[in-house]
């Protein structure tokens, strides 16, 4: 009996729409058994599926995966049709009978009525032709045999598993030891089908087809499903096939529920989404699922969103998926106030769970309304419509408007009235510059988007292109040479580790996509930094922001090395990891405060200054393991080696003579192989006898001379092979070219025959043997004493290459002589470091294995011993249980526990016996210690200044990250590391040097860590030397304070009320003299505006003055030239007005006085970092100041320059209030803070502990707003 009938014992089909009953035994692992049988097909549907009566249908697999199907890529799921469906299975023995009596014969003609299944679980009936693929009848078929069971879709076991679905006569069987991976749902239209009563002896001529050839399984796997029951979350098995989602209790079930995904949308469950859950929304139902991890969840979402475009057989990655262009990225959210749906325009109540929001464009929608949402998310280069594409010589960017749902304090950029409404969806907001305007004012607003304050960091979507059409965006070449200052002077590339910071990186991803171009924000867990660096590498300069820990920073810097972009980019760090030592040193703080907006990061990065960070290569040369001699090989003494070496030399000479006298290519090839074999045997004998050779100087000299002779024979061989190859190729090329020219005049392409290929391979092998002999000679010389080395130096390569040559042939350039000269030059070009690193004990290794290799690059610190052991244990535990290490506080607690454990174990209490230290070539005598730390920065292990202080002493210089020096520190135990967090220790300093060499002795490895990444280092040498320097962005707090001070002054200037004239005075016209003065002031203002516009293209911080510049330019154009200006410098092309009223003069003067005050405050705070530009700007301001003094002499103009002061009574009352209450409060606070007698020791210890952490907390906080007294 076939295995398809055996599945009926483990699983039975559900009745009347109930859930399928689980197997009485827990499902064992793979390979799974086939699904349970189902009723035979009914005659009516059979006639629809096939025009001819089919006597015996092959059971068809449900539209799910086969037992061998996995959740791998969908491209691996194609299968070939099975030409022999009745092939006998070989891998499924049936030694034990396990039959089940069938209640009815398989040939019963009466159809059995089908039960009432769920309509959504019905798959598409396309694979009906599979019913014609059975060549022989099966009278033992029971009524439960399902016609939906089709042959396996995987290609390898097709011939083996096909009989499972084509029943044969078998009296007994044994069930398969594992359930099927997945079976497809049972179609309700096919559930009543039964087999034909009259079997046909002849097979059908049609080729059998499987479900997997029609619809591929795009993804499958287990997920948790929210069942709205007591347990809520239950494990189910899911798969996506075609445009449908199938799920069941277990992959072995034959009956699956079905969800149609042709009209569906997906929304994540929350903003941070720690549970990796998402909701699939269709017009009929909503289902909430939870994936094992975020990567798996994003793959499901990517597939579900992609197949809405149709049945797609290859799903691209989400980052480069052209099918997702313009689609919204929804997640569930709620608001404390009423919102409005951007699709149906209806209101969304406050705290409603039915609201979802797009993480990029912040569009709101009901869940069901999202099905009808248009694909108008924030633009990238692929989603811009044709009418928005601009010519290549323009960098202008249009606005992208979103209607309604304004922030509370929104104001119209045109009329400065409030925008938005709680009652309806009205007014518009630009996604790029965040400007809000009324619908009526939008036509009067500028058509060009200026990106507001962050325009220097944003890449316009018009500047990107997709030349290959694969979603890999690059900066268009048409925009490289344009003036990017108005839109993108120094763009910002953002890399975020979404797992860092207790999944705070997810919030950063969404926020930065809202503030910037979504195409310039990358998740490091999705392909790493390669895609972002490839897109930005054509910019002359750009900035990089890494949101993560020290490991993420090292990852990005290593890719910058590979791309060679250190001269172009500057890197800033936002601390989201555990230690964040580099971020502390660069001034970005110990951690990021979750209560702060990520928008502050953009301001700080744009105001940061550049500092150089030294980077160091960690070079490793491991001591190769002593490999025992092969079976049959024994160690050789010196006499035996001498005899064997002479035989090898004679054999090599004999074979070389055969090569020189060979008449046929085959003879040359055979002799060359024997010559190479003789050289290999010679090298192996040296390895065997080296233990005896290195104790005898005479034997060492003999090895050098014999190796020299072998090297000379190989040089002759290589020259002969080169001459033969050149002559043969020239002759053959000429012959073939002549033949081809006579034939059809096609272009000639030379071909390499078998003999030429063999000669080429032998020449390559001979060159490799030459390198080995070269290494042997130089290493053997190192074993000689000084006297013998001086004696043999003349007899080495110098005697071989020059002294033995005939003086008459010195000027000749024979091939042999050329080869020798080339070899000598290559030997002389070897570095002394390579010669010192060779070891003849390990010649059976390749030369590369006994040289230094760069293991990694150090940015922060290097540790060996105790601290590396703690870091290694922590990393091992985190890899095993990632859920327990998802927060910064937990990680610090684990570090403390592991350090306490080492306090008791003292694993490396005698490390100085196994480790030797050299600093700048000088051997350092080590005390009794447990670890060594090499510092590049002044922060170690989460904020410890392990060097002790940042000041210089008589013995050591002050440490710095750009001084080209390393600080070496000793670790005596866990207590010392703990005390270093409280007080500065100095007694454990070892050295300050430019290069460090550490030797590890013994046979066991020692833990080593670089920047928190630890591993077990085998015995050998570790060298730390300078590699290169990186440009890092450090937080400039002085500049930030100056900018805040300017912003405070700017706010006061803008808040100053404009003086008002009497109605009669306001209507009077200016005199000729007054009008001339106003015209002169306007010209000076135009000069200042022009200078500020030019400086804004060079200095990005000047952009804060553009608001005052635009306002002054507009009022000059409106009043002096009578035009509605959107252009700052449009006055030159207009006809000036002949006279002005006093009211207009007051408006112009007040606006220009505001621009003057803003610019003066900008220079007073030293915000312009260029002395030459500051001098030019100051001269323009001085000219305007002189004109203001002349205008202040006019009586009706004086209130503008001398504002009214407040009355003395108000000031005195205000002063008394300011002085009286703070004194009482201060006295009370001092009394409360006065320590009691029993708390003095506790207070001292607490203050001592918290003193180390106050600086980090202060770094994360913004400085206080400057008071009026400071101004």
From Swiss-Prot:
It comes from the Eukaryota. It is a peripheral membrane protein. Belongs to the eukaryotic diacylglycerol kinase family. Its main location: membrane. Its EC number is 2.7.1.107. Sequence repeats lie at residues 48-51, 52-55, 56-59, 60-63, 64-67, 68-71, 72-75, 76-79, 80-83, 84-87, 88-91, 92-95, 96-99, 100-103, 104-107, 108-111, 112-115, 116-119, 120-123, 124-127, 128-131, 132-135, 136-139, 140-143, 144-147, 148-151, 152-155, 156-159, 160-163, 164-167, 168-171, 172-175, 176-179. Inhibited in response to H(2)O(2). Keywords: ATP-binding, Cell membrane, Kinase, Lipid metabolism, Membrane, Metal-binding, Nucleotide-binding, Phosphoprotein, Repeat, Transferase, Zinc, Zinc-finger. This is Diacylglycerol kinase kappa. Does not form homooligomers. Residues 1-160, 190-209, 805-825, 1252-1271 are annotated as: Disordered. Residues 48-179 are annotated as: 33 X 4 AA approximate tandem repeats of E-P-A-P. Residues 216-309 form the PH domain.
């Amino acid at each position: 009996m076939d295995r398809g009938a055996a599945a009926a014992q483990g699983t039975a089909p559900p009745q009347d729409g109930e859930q399928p009953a689980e197997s009485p035994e827990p499902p064992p692992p793979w390979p799974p058994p086939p699904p349970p049988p189902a009723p035979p097909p009914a005659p009516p549907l059979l006639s629809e599926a096939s025009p001819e009566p089919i006597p015996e249908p092959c059971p068809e697999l449900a539209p799910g995966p086969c037992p061998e199907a996995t959740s791998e890529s969908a491209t691996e799921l194609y299968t070939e049709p099975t030409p022999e469906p009745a092939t006998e299975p070989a891998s499924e023995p049936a030694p034990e009978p396990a039959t089940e009596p069938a209640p009815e014969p398989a040939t019963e003609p009466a159809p059995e009525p089908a039960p009432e299944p769920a309509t959504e679980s019905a798959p598409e009936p396309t694979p009906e032709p599979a019913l014609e693929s059975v060549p022989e009848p099966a009278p033992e078929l029971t009524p439960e045999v399902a016609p939906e069971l089709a042959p396996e879709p995987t290609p390898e076991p097709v011939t083996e598993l096909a009989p499972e679905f084509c029943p044969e006569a078998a009296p007994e069987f044994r069930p398969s030891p594992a359930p099927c991976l997945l079976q497809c749902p049972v179609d309700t239209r096919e559930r009543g089908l039964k087999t034909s009563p009259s079997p046909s002896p002849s097979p059908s001529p049609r080729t059998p087809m499987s479900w997997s050839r029609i619809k591929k399984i795009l993804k499958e796997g287990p997920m948790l499903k929210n069942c709205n029951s007591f347990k809520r979350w239950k494990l189910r098995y899911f798969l996506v096939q075609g445009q449908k989602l199938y799920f069941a209790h277990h992959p072995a079930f034959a009956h699956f529920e079905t969800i149609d995904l042709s009209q569906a949308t997906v929304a994540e469950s929350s903003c941070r989404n720690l549970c990796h859950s998402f909701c699939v929304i269709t017009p009929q139902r909503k289902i909430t699922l939870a994936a094992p991890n975020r990567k798996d969840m994003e793959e499901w979402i990517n597939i579900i969103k992609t197949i809405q475009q149709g049945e797609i057989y290859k799903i691209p990655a989400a980052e480069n998926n052209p099918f997702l262009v313009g689609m919204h990225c929804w997640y569930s959210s709620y608001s404390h106030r009423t919102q409005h749906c951007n699709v149906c325009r209806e209101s969304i109540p406050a705290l409603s769970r039915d609201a979802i929001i797009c993480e990029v464009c912040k569009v709101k929608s009901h869940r069901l309304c999202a099905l009808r949402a248009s694909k108008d998310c924030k633009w990238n280069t692929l989603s811009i419509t044709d009418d928005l594409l601009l010519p290549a010589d323009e960098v202008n960017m249009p606005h992208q408007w979103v209607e309604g749902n304004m922030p509370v304090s929104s104001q119209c950029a045109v009329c400065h009235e409030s925008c938005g409404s709680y009652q309806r969806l009205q007014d518009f907001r630009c996604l790029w510059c965040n400007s809000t305007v009324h619908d009526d004012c939008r036509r009067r607003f500028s058509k060009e988007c200026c990106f507001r304050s962050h325009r220097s960091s944003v890449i316009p979507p018009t500047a990107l292109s997709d030349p290959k059409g694969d979603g890999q965006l690059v900066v268009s070449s048409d925009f490289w040479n344009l003036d990017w200052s108005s839109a993108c002077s120094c763009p910002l590339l953002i890399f975020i580790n979404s797992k860092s910071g207790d999944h705070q990186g997810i919030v950063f991803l969404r926020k930065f996509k809202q503030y910037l171009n979504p195409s310039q924000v990358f998740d490091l867990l999705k392909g790493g930094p390669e895609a972002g660096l490839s897109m930005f590498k054509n910019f002359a300069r750009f900035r990089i922001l890494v949101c993560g820990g020290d490991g993420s920073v090292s990852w990005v810097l290593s890719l910058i090395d590979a791309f060679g972009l250190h001269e172009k980019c500057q890197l800033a760090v936002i601390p989201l990891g555990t230690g964040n030592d580099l971020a502390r040193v660069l001034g970005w703080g110990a951690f990021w405060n979750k209560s702060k907006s990520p928008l502050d990061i953009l301001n700080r990065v744009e105001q940061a200054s550049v500092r150089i960070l030294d980077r160091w290569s960690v070079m490793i040369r491991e001591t190769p393991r002593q490999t025992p001699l092969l079976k049959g090989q024994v160690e050789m003494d010196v006499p035996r080696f001498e005899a064997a070496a002479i035989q090898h030399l004679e054999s090599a000479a004999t074979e070389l003579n055969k090569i020189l006298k060979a008449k046929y290519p085959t003879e040359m090839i055979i002799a060359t192989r024997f010559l190479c074999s003789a050289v290999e045997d010679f090298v192996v004998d040296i390895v065997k006898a080296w233990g005896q050779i290195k104790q005898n100087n005479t034997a060492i000299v003999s090895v050098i001379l014999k190796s020299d002779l072998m090297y000379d024979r190989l040089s002759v061989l290589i020259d002969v092979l080169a001459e033969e190859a050149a002559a043969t190729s020239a002759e053959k090329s000429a012959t073939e070219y002549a033949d081809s020219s006579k034939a059809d005049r096609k272009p000639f392409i030379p071909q390499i025959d078998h003999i030429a290929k063999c000669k080429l391979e032998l020449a390559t092998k001979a060159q490799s043997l030459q390198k080995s002999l070269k290494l042997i000679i130089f290493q053997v010389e190192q074993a000689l004493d000084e006297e013998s080395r001086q004696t043999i130096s003349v007899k080495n390569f110098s005697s071989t290459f020059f002294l033995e040559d005939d003086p008459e042939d010195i000027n000749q350039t024979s091939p042999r002589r050329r080869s020798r000269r080339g070899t000598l030059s290559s030997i002389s070009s070897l570095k002394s470091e390579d010669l010192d690193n060779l070891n003849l004990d390990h010649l059976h290794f390749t030369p590369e294995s006994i040289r230094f290799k760069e293991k990694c690059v150090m940015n922060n610190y290097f540790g060996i011993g105790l601290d590396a052991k703690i870091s290694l244990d922590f990393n091992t535990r985190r890899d095993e249980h990632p859920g327990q290490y998802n927060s910064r506080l937990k990680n610090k607690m684990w570090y403390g526990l592991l350090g306490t454990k080492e306090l008791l174990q003292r694993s490396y209490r005698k490390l100085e016996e196994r480790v030797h230290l050299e600093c700048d070539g000088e051997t350092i005598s080590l005390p009794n210690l447990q670890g060594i730390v090499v510092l590049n920065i002044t922060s170690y292990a989460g904020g410890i200044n392990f060097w002790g202080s940042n000041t210089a002493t008589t013995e050591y210089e002050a440490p710095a990250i750009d001084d080209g020096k390393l600080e070496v520190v000793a670790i005596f135990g866990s207590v010392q590391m703990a005390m270093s967090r409280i007080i500065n220790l100095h007694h454990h300093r070892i050295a300050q040097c430019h290069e460090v060499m550490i030797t590890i002795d013994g046979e066991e490895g020692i833990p080593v860590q670089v920047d928190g990444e630890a591993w077990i280092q085998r015995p050998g040498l570790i060298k730390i030397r300078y590699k290169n320097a990186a440009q890092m962005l450090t937080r400039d707090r002085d500049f930030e304070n100056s900018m805040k001070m300017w912003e405070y002054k700017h706010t006061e200037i803008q808040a100053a009320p404009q003086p008002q004239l009497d109605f009669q005075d306001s209507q009077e016209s200016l005199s000729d003299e007054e009008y001339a003065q106003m015209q002169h002031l306007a010209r000076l203002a135009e000069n200042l505006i022009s200078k500020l516009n030019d400086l804004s293209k060079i200095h990005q911080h000047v952009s804060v003055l553009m608001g005052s510049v635009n306002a002054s330019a507009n009022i000059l154009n409106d009043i002096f030239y009578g035009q509605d200006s959107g252009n700052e410098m449009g006055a030159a092309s207009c006809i000036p007005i002949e006279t002005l009223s006093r009211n207009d003069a007051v408006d112009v003067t007040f606006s220009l006085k505001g621009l003057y005050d803003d610019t003066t405050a900008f220079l007073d705070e030293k915000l312009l970092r260029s002395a030459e530009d500051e001098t030019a700007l100051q001269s323009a301001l001085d000219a305007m100041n002189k004109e203001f003094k002349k205008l202040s002499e006019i009586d009706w103009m004086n209130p503008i320059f001398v504002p009214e002061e407040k009355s003395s009574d108000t000031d005195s009352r205000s002063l008394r209030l300011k002085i009286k209450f703070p004194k009482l409060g201060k006295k009370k606070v001092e009394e409360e803070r006065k320590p009691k007698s029993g708390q003095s020791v506790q207070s001292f210890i607490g203050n001592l502990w918290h003193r180390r952490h106050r600086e980090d907390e202060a770094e994360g906080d913004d400085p206080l707003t400057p008071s009026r007294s400071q101004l």
